[in-house]
Curated annotation (Swiss-Prot):
Lineage, broadest ranks: Bacteria, Pseudomonadati, Pseudomonadota, Gammaproteobacteria, Chromatiales
List of catalytic residues: 37 (proton donor)
Protein name as it appears in the record: Pantothenate synthetase
Alphabetically ordered keywords of this record: ATP-binding, Cytoplasm, Ligase, Nucleotide-binding, Pantothenate biosynthesis
Organism: Alkalilimnicola ehrlichii (strain ATCC BAA-1101 / DSM 17681 / MLHE-1)
Assembly information from the UniProt record: Homodimer.
Transmembrane segments: none
GO cellular component terms listed in the entry, alphabetical order: cytosol
Extra facts: The reaction proceeds by a bi uni uni bi ping pong mechanism.
Pathway assigned to this chain's UniProt record: Cofactor biosynthesis; (R)-pantothenate biosynthesis; (R)-pantothenate from (R)-pantoate and beta-alanine: step 1/1
Gene Ontology terms for molecular function: ATP binding; pantoate-beta-alanine ligase activity
Protein residues bound to beta-alanine: 61
Residues engaged in binding ATP: 30-37, 149-152, 178, 186-189
UniProt-annotated location(s): Cytoplasm
Length: 286
């Protein structure tokens, strides 16, 4: 497995693969990899001939009071896990390689309304940072296919919109959320949880499951369900950020009669901000 830090070296490697007619896949990450990240590589491997994973803690997607400086860097362990999954190259550039004119002066990719709801409210500018770095990676790797986890549903929809709006020739795949045995969605930030908080943490998913069960049973008073769910989270010890039943396509508030839904939630538990979702496809005619 090759380890690359310079964009020129990455471009040269991909150009060699292209000359051989090989199909290239990309798994973008920020490192500190867990089994969910490694599962992304395993998921994508059958869909390409060569697989690149990027490891880059992107300062542009962190707010001023967020955990950019303290975000764990575990490059050696990450590379060992990726190599064991058959990844062909790891691209881990320093910040100055990705933002040569400095982060503040960097050109940005603004997404619009889709990025201004849910996580976009409490993390203003976050999805601008995500969209910008992903477009840069797409330009550098020019992958045929890339994969993102469905746990970060809003991020997946943002990337899908960017690819569509900017006519980027890449197939975007969303991989189902990888969970711990007790249902907690795997996340790098789970490492911030204390032992007691870790015991509480699966309550976010259980709350979403309860809401989804009611919706499948025909309850379409979504605002009441949201209020009840937020109260349940608070009772368990969470500090809810949002808990909403949304249209799956544009993440606007769902209304009775909508069929494609996502029940999405974010909540603080100690130092960890946890997010999760459940996607629903309803058939109200039954």
């Amino acid at each position: 497995m090759k380890r690359l830090k310079r964009t020129a070296d990455l471009r040269a490697l991909v150009a060699d693969w292209r000359r051989e007619g090989l199909r290239v896949g990309l798994v973008p990450t920020m490192g500190n990899l867990h089994e969910g990240h490694l599962a992304l590589a395993e998921y994508l491997a059958p869909h390409c001939d060569r697989l690149v994973t990027s490891i880059f803690v992107n300062p542009l997607q962190f707010g001023p009071n967020e955990d950019y400086e303290s975000y764990p860097r575990t490059f050696g362990e990450d590379c060992a896990g990726l190599e064991a999954r058959g990844v062909d190259a790891v691209f881990a550039p320093p910040v100055e390689e990705m933002y040569r004119g400095g982060v503040r002066q960097a050109t940005r990719v603004e997404v619009g309304a889709l990025a201004e709801r849910l996580c976009g409210i409490s993390r203003p500018g976050h999805f601008t940072g995500v969209a910008t770095v992903v477009v840069k990676l797409f330009n550098l790797v020019q992958p045929d296919v890339a994969v993102f986890g469905r746990k970060d549903y809003q991020q997946l929809r943002v990337i899908e919109q960017v690819v569509s709006d900017l006519n980027i020739p890449v197939e975007v795949r969303g991989m189902p959320t990888v969970r711990e045995p007790d249902g907690l969605a795997m996340s790098s930030r789970n490492g911030y949880l204390t032992q007691q908080e870790r015991h509480i943490a699966p309550g976010l998913y259980r709350t979403l499951q309860g809401m989804a069960k009611r919706i499948r049973a025909g309850d379409d008073d979504y605002r009441r369900l949201e209020a009840r769910g937020r109260a349940m989270l608070a009772e368990q010890g969470f500090q809810p950020d949002y808990l909403e039943v949304c249209r799956a396509d544009d993440l606007t508030p769902a209304a009775p009669g909508d069929r494609g839904l996502v029940v999405a939630g974010a909540a603080w538990l100690g130092r960890a901000r946890l997010i999760d979702n459940i996607e629903l496809e309803l058939n109200r005619d039954q």
